[in-house]
Amino acid sequence: MDCQKLFSVIDTLSEEYFAILEDVCNLESPTADKAGVDKVGAYFVEMARKRGWKVESLPLETAGDPICITLNPEANARPVTFSGHIDTVHPVGLFGYPPARREGDKLYGPGALDCKGGVVASFLAMDALERCGFTARPVQLIIQTDEETGSKTSGKKTVDYMCSMAKDAVAFLNTEGSDGNKITVARKGILRYQFHIRGKATHSSRCEKGVNAIVEAAHKILKLEELKDPEGLTCNCGVIRGGTVANTVAEECSFLADIRFANQEQCEQAQALVQELAEHSYLPGCTCRLEKVSDRPAMPLEDRNLALLETINGIYAQVGLDALIGKKERGGSDTAYTTRAGIPCLDGFGVDGDGIHSVREYALLSSLVTSAKRQAAVAWGI
């Protein structure tokens, strides 16, 4: 099969897929809105079934149903797997109506960059592969539904499903937002803890008789905020609630700590520090209850992932695509789980844009074409 013909088909189909991305961005799908997430999933399922592709899904009660769409399911070779998530972070209505809008090469809307654009690019790549007669191996598209909560919404059922469906993949390409020709080979993991602190209330005029839970929280926060190593542990305490009125010593205070780590050793170090902080009181009479809110493993630098990058760059050299440069990211993603499962994977094959997790989020439509070509070339050449 001629890869240049494949690229030409992608170019020809591009306007159709720009409209598809606008459609799915107009379907708002915050993670907790199962009906909204499933509506986006149903959009892709309908497209796949019209083409005669195999469709599988995992019915869930609390999260959107994750989906696996397969082109050439009967082919006798290891699959190439594309993956991306369709859940977003903002409440319905925050973007106004309609949520999506086009301005030149920019498409604004919830999830345009993170990560609906990447999923649409994967579908475009598969569509073009089929139109060009590609039958050499299965090509999967796994659609994730609760990535934005670290898969807490489903109790990790979605990532277990993803790893199970992709277990035989020769390459797993995750379609989080792109950064030019840089591709993600390692990511930090995430630990989130809620600290619930209880002191002793009293009238503020007799504050020496009370124990201020907010002050205890402040001591703990300052200790956690010492973690600021870009290559190691970092912590952000971004949410705090405490007290009732100005003339009462605060009896209760809670705060949320978001800790990032690069490897398992750092993860264990962070867990030990958090436990020690919870057990130690800076103010006599204060107690602390620790709640683990969510977690996601790190995607450490692995030889098999670097080897996959080298293989892909060899393919790109043959077909005239720019080489990719590996980079480390501090944010988490689902490739942490596929890496832990031993599946060769890389991240950042989605679209370019800016404003992630804000009402200014946009995708560059021209980058959707680039993303589709990069993904299709891997399936064609690996």
Question: Which residue stretches match the model-derived regions?
Answer:
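Flexible, glycine/proline-enriched loop segments at strand-loop-helix junctions
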Residues: G109-L113, Q144-G150, T202-V211
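Acidic/histidine-rich catalytic neighborhood of metal-dependent amide-processing enzymes
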Residues: K116-K188
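Glycine/serine-rich anion-binding loops at beta->alpha junctions
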Residues: H90, K106-V120, H203
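Acidic/His- and Gly-rich active-site-bordering loop/insert found
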Residues: D2-P110, R131-F134, G314-Y316, T335
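Short beta-strand segments
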Residues: S83-G84, I142-Q144, F172-E176, H196-R198, ...
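Broad gene-expression machinery/nucleic-acid interaction feature
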Residues: P66, Y97, P138, F172, ...
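Metal-dependent amide/peptide-bond hydrolase catalytic core
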Residues: M1-K5, T12, S29, E56-P59, ...
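Short glycine-aspartate micro-motif
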Residues: P79-T81, L107, V170-N174, R192-Q194, ...
